[in-house]
């Protein structure tokens, strides 16, 4: 039987974008309505059909078209995300591609910042998702000493770095999606190493540069906390901070870090105090020649970060809500169908790996070939979406995942997926990981497709704004107590070996940096969760700038000009992993926002003793 052809209607494609009738126009809150967006959206349909009709087999393409799973980034002929070695860029410079401008290794802090911007912006155009550097403060510290820099000079360079990383310079008029990880204190495995700067080995070690690291962190925090000229937050780079057992909670810059977090909620906090994460894995992935395929490794550095010279070749997310609906009361049948979908997802990822590697070898991704060369250390990623709605449909809405029966089912399902990951690693020789995929557009696509096919399926949201709860997260209106959420999510969060994070959505600015610090400290020391964020809601008025909390119109403007039209404001919060205005969310994510019960400090303060599902670290 011949597979049906899906020809792209050029006129309809352009008009659907221009009149915004195509749901993809707002699927990604980082991509504004623009000429670049029109070009990407139009070209993306051609590329997606190329993948589905020419590269993948019909048996792989059909479940995507029908909504059984979602093959991410079909509109881009590229791998998903990548972590790069900042040390290598500093030592070698940005060069090595024929016919392109070549930069020698940087000798100064300012030129290193310039090469970082150029590198991330250029590599972003060879990948679909996040681009990451680890140990930013450690690797940049030698320049501060060699240049004998004043603090104000560092701030100026940091302003240029951050502003330039927030310019919509990539395909589709988007900002490069970037992540920087900060060590805060020099890691043990780098402490005795002498940096190589400008082809010369310096006479000091990374471990002697704590003062310079402190200046870099202080400057970065100052610029990010200040926001742009209108008081608007910088969306990128997303900062990840490594919180290790020796993290000094009363040390230099800590108050500034948590003042920034209380106001804007920008950082991801990576838990090296009380989790399975190993700080040295950030750098060791790129030099492990023999990986044990019987174990599941962690990608490192959070939902949008990757350890050095690793990342993900691609992501396939399973529609769990549909499985719960189709196999109501039949867990054995549900698991059997899930296994079939995982096998197909794996086939798609193996084909993608082979395809992208072939074209990397033949010059389509020249900078990735220069600085990476091989995809051997890149994971194949399988994710889940709508575990809560899976349970609700499976039980005919008798219970959800907050019920012990639903929770236990989710644990069994995730353990089965992990088991399959190991089998796939041994069968293919490639690394696999399980991710709580952000599914920003996917959650709405799944809900929309399921509503068409199964009108009585149980969904979150409303008929006008349907969505599925992300991964195995709690229902968004379940509790206002962040510590209750941590207690209930700790076990499930630990099942993921790719990106996962628990966002603590706060209704407004946390009352103080000290209160914010205490919330993070208690969370990371009490619970074995790999990553958390504090995510306050805030608003931006064109006249008054930053306003704490949700304000779709400005009260200050109304008080000053009671007879004038209300002054509209942007309301900002995380759309999964990064901050964007709620007004730019897709329909499903708006539905989620409207239903979300925000966490409160009052509820957190009243919680009492924190109870972990695991024994304390010292007793294990």
Residues covered by each model-derived region:
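Conserved catalytic cores of very large enzyme subunits
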Residues: 2-376, 397, 403-562, 571
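Metallocofactor- and cofactor-centric catalytic cores in central/energy metabolism, strongly enriched
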Residues: 154-158, 162, 393, 580, ...
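Short alpha-helix boundary/capping elements
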Residues: 188, 395, 576-580
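Residue-level signature of transmembrane alpha-helix interfaces in integral membrane proteins
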Residues: 199, 399, 449-451, 590-596, ...
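Extended amphipathic alpha-helical segments enriched in small hydrophobics
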Residues: 378, 382-391
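Glycine-centered flexibility sites
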Residues: 383-386, 498, 577, 588
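Intrinsic, low-complexity terminal and presequence regions
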Residues: 539-620
């Amino acid at each position: 039987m011949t597979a049906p052809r899906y020809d792209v209607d050029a006129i309809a494609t352009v008009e659907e974008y221009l009149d915004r009738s195509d749901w993809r126009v707002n699927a990604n809150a980082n991509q504004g309505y623009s000429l670049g967006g029109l070009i990407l959206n139009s070209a993306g349909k051609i590329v997606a059909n190329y993948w589905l009709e020419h590269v993948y087999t019909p048996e792989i393409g059909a479940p995507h078209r029908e909504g059984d799973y979602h093959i991410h980034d079909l509109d881009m002929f590229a791998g998903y995300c990548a972590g790069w070695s900042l040390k290598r860029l500093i030592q070698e410079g940005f060069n090595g591609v024929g016919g392109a401008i070549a930069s020698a290794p940087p000798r100064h802090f300012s030129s290193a910042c310039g090469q970082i911007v150029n590198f991330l912006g250029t590599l972003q155009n060879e990948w679909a998702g996040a681009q990451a550097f680890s140990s930013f403060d450690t690797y940049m510290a030698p320049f501060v000493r060699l240049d004998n820099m004043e603090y104000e000079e560092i701030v100026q360079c940091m302003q240029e770095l951050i502003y330039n990383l927030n310019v919509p310079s990539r395909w589709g008029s988007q900002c490069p999606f970037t992540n920087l990880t900060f060590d805060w204190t020099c890691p043990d495995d780098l402490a005795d190493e002498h940096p190589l700067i400008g082809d010369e080995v310096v006479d000091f070690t990374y471990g002697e540069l704590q003062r310079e690291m402190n200046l870099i962190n202080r400057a970065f925090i100052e610029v990010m906390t200040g926001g742009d000229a209108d008081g608007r937050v910088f969306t990128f780079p997303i900062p990840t901070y490594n919180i290790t057992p020796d993290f000094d909670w009363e040390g230099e810059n800590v108050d500034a870090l948590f003042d920034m977090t209380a106001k804007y909620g920008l950082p991801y906090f990576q838990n090296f105090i009380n989790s399975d994460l190993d700080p040295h894995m950030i750098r060791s992935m790129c030099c492990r020649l023999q990986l044990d395929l019987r174990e599941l490794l962690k990608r490192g550095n959070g939902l949008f970060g990757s350890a050095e010279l690793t990342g993900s070749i691609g992501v396939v997310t399973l529609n769990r809500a549909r499985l719960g609906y189709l196999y109501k009361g039949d867990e054995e049948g549900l698991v059997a169908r899930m296994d079939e979908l995982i096998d197909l997802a794996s086939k798609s990822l193996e084909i993608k790996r082979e395809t992208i590697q072939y074209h990397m070898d033949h010059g389509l991704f020249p900078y990735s070939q220069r600085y990476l060369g091989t995809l051997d250390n890149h994971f194949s990623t399988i994710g889940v979406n709508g575990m809560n709605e899976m349970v609700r449909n499976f039980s005919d809405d008798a219970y959800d995942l907050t019920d012990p029966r639903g929770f236990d089912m989710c644990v069994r399902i995730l353990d089965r997926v992990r088991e399959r990951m190991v089998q796939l690693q041994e069968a293919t020789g490639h690394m696999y990981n399980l991710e709580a995929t952000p599914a920003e557009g996917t959650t709405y696509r799944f809900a929309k497709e399921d509503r068409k096919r199964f009108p009585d399926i149980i969904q979150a949201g409303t008929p006008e704004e349907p969505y599925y709860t992300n991964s195995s997260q709690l229902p968004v209106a379940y509790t206002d107590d962040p510590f209750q959420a941590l207690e209930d999510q700790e076990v499930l969060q630990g099942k993921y070996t790719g990106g996962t994070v628990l966002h603590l959505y706060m209704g407004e600015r946390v009352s103080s940096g000290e209160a914010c610090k205490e919330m993070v400290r208690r969370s990371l020391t009490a619970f074995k969760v790999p990553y958390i964020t504090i995510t306050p809601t805030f608003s931006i008025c064109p006249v008054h700038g930053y306003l704490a909390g949700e304000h779709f119109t400005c009260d200050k403007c109304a008080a000053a000009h009671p007879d004038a039209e209300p002054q509209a404001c942007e309301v900002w919060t995380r759309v999964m992993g990064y901050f964007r205005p709620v007004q730019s969310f897709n329909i499903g994510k708006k539905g989620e926002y409207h239903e979300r019960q925000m966490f409160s400090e009052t509820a957190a303060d009243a919680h009492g003793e924190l109870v972990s599902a695991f024994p304390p670290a010292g007793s294990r």
